[in-house]
């Protein structure tokens, strides 16, 4: 809507009340409905919302195909929409997790069988590297400008930390040993009584994880998920390792990355295949 109303001089509102209802925090877009009361808004209903979405999608497609389209603004809008999709899945998992019947978000989704990946360490030599970008293609402001940074020698694992490895951390009382934690992290850990990743539950000596595909017995080979930065940092210290820096990760991620996209309808991270 922001893109369309800026570019199209004859833009017609689907519903003028939507600006007020759906403005989460954009001050320049006008007044906003009280944040603490937004959860009680039950109208417009799902059919009207889907029709609104369909209308906006069609207008964006038409605009992108026109000769006077502003592709930069459209691309920013598309990236922002992808953030919304990620947040909606996160909220859906959190909301459904309170249902005692452990419902599935998508009953048609199949589970992925994760392989036990052999861990290898990929080495990077000391170097001065360019990070960020000055290119004309899309980028966020925080990714600019391109500049040089000194990268000291480091190694990074070829695979993600698995649930099985995380259970070892739990069994070693990792959540109760302050020496592994940053100060704020350990305070939060104690205050909120963290003893495992979010959505994990132990029943009859077995660990279960609530996912968008319902509650499942933990797949020991699957990458761990639903953890905080504090937990990740504590695990790294317990492992006598550390997390990569922002610049180390930017350099390392220039290698081929095995991706998992929303279209796959696999709403959990999964391990790459051996040899991939």
Q: Residue locations for each model-derived region?
A:
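Cytochrome P450 catalytic-domain "roof"
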Residues: 60-69
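Short alpha-helical functional segments enriched in proximate histidine and acidic residues
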Residues: 2-6, 63, 87-91, 169, ...
């Amino acid at each position: 809507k922001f893109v369309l109303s800026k570019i199209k001089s004859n833009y017609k509102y689907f519903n003028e009340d939507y600006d007020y209802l759906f403005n989460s925090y954009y001050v320049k877009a006008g007044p906003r409905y009280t944040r603490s009361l937004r959860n009680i808004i039950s109208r417009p209903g799902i059919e009207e919302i889907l029709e609104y979405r369909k209308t906006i999608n069609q207008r964006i497609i038409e605009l992108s195909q026109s000769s006077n389209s502003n592709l930069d603004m459209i691309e920013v809008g598309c990236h922002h929409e992808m953030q919304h999709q990620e947040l909606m899945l996160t909220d859906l998992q959190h909301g459904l997790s309170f249902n005692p019947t452990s419902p599935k978000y998508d009953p048609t989704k199949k589970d992925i069988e994760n392989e036990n990946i052999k861990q290898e360490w990929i080495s990077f030599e000391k170097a001065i590297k360019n990070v960020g970008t000055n290119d004309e293609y899309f980028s966020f402001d925080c990714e600019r400008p391109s500049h040089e940074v000194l990268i000291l020698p480091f190694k990074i694992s070829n695979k993600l930390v698995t649930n099985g490895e995380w259970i070892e951390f739990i069994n070693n009382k990792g959540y109760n040993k302050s020496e592994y934690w940053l100060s704020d992290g350990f305070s939060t850990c104690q205050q909120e009584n963290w003893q495992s990743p979010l959505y994990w539950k132990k029943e009859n000596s077995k660990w279960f994880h609530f996912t968008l595909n319902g509650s499942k017995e933990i797949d020991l080979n699957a990458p761990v998920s639903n953890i905080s930065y504090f937990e990740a940092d504590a695990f790294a210290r317990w492992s006598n390792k550390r997390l990569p820096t922002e610049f180390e990760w930017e350099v390392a991620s220039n290698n081929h990355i095995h991706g998992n996209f929303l279209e796959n309808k696999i709403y959990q991270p999964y391990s790459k295949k051996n040899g991939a």
